[in-house]
């Protein structure tokens, strides 16, 4: 299970995305061996997509998080939910966004063999920033959300969230935290 951000420090134009010398993205994973494989692949071939080449790699340790930590989204959260067999996209416009986000994350914790007790994810009450965004991936339109959040729990639970991201499809660039 891993997470990666969208490109940061870029400028969108009609012609496409312009990168600068300080543009970057980050990749995080709960299992360090995944990061080692990714870094090895980048070092073998630094070409990414659309002619972008990696010019440097920095490896950082997981920060020491407090039992309540605020995060911004480095990529929008994709949250899909099945209601009576029908798939729906849950966004910040839905009353049950926080509830479904918590259930989704508790499932990730449980699947990783980690404790789910005491974890709580909520929209940051000190921020008025809220945005929904339609993101097309492989021809599929996905309704996503960008919103500052607060995660309360153990340092292990919060570190796990930071490492694997929130919501669905974190391995293809959704739900990364910064």
Go through the PLM ranges and name each one:
Residues 1-178:
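RNA-interacting cores
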């Amino acid at each position: 299970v891993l997470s990666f951000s969208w490109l940061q420090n870029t400028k969108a134009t009609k012609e496409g995305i312009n990168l600068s010398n300080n543009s970057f993205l980050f990749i995080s994973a709960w299992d360090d061996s995944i990061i080692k494989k990714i870094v090895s692949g980048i070092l073998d071939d630094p070409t990414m997509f659309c002619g972008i080449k990696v010019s440097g790699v920095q490896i950082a340790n997981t920060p020491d998080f407090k039992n309540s930590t605020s995060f911004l989204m480095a990529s929008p959260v994709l949250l899909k939910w099945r209601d009576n067999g029908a798939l729906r996209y849950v966004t910040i416009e839905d009353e049950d966004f926080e509830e479904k986000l918590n259930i989704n994350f508790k499932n990730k914790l449980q699947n990783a063999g980690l404790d789910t007790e005491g974890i709580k994810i909520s929209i940051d009450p000190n921020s008025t920033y809220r945005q929904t965004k339609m993101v097309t991936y492989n021809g599929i339109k996905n309704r996503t959300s960008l919103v500052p959040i607060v995660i309360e729990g153990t340092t292990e639970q919060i570190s796990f969230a930071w490492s694997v991201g929130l919501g669905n499809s974190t391995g293809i660039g959704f739900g990364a935290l910064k």
